[in-house]
């Protein structure tokens, strides 16, 4: 219902106010898509050696936090585990990167719809270990 409201009311109103707004939005979207693809290629070239189920915390602490988040997200995706929420990602960063993790450090998550298996990250021998829950 919201989608129809946007399509039938909001977009025509925008089109009246700004000429070729849909075309501009489409062009911007395409530009972002291309930039995203470029980022993905460069990211994987630079950090592919870290994208794994076992990652040294020391290596992650030497990298800017936005890249650490992407390394963790790519590693989770590689294991076919449900992607954690933004809040859980923040907890992972706080627990393993911003703090000094120990053997009891653990962050886990699930999906309410059970569409994908949940995951957990623990700390062992200086590494975070990403596994299915």
List PLM regions with ranges.
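Conserved anion/nucleotide-ligand pocket segment
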Residues: 9-22
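Noncatalytic alpha-helical scaffolds and linker/capping helices
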Residues: 1-2
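AMP-forming adenylation/ATP pyrophosphatase catalytic core
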Residues: 8-11, 26-133
């Amino acid at each position: 219902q919201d989608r129809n409201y946007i399509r039938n009311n909001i977009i025509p109103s925008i089109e009246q106010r700004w000429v070729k707004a849909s075309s501009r939005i489409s062009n911007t979207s395409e530009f972002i898509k291309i930039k995203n693809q470029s980022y993905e290629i460069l990211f994987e070239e630079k950090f592919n050696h870290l994208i794994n189920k076992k990652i040294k915390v020391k290596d992650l602490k030497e990298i800017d936090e936005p890249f650490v988040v992407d390394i963790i997200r790519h590693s989770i995706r590689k294991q076919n585990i449900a992607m954690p929420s933004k809040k859980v990602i923040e907890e992972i960063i706080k627990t393993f990167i911003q703090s000094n993790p120990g053997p009891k450090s653990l962050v886990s998550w699930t999906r309410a719809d059970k569409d994908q298996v949940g995951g957990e990250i623990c700390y062992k021998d200086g590494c975070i270990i990403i596994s299915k829950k």
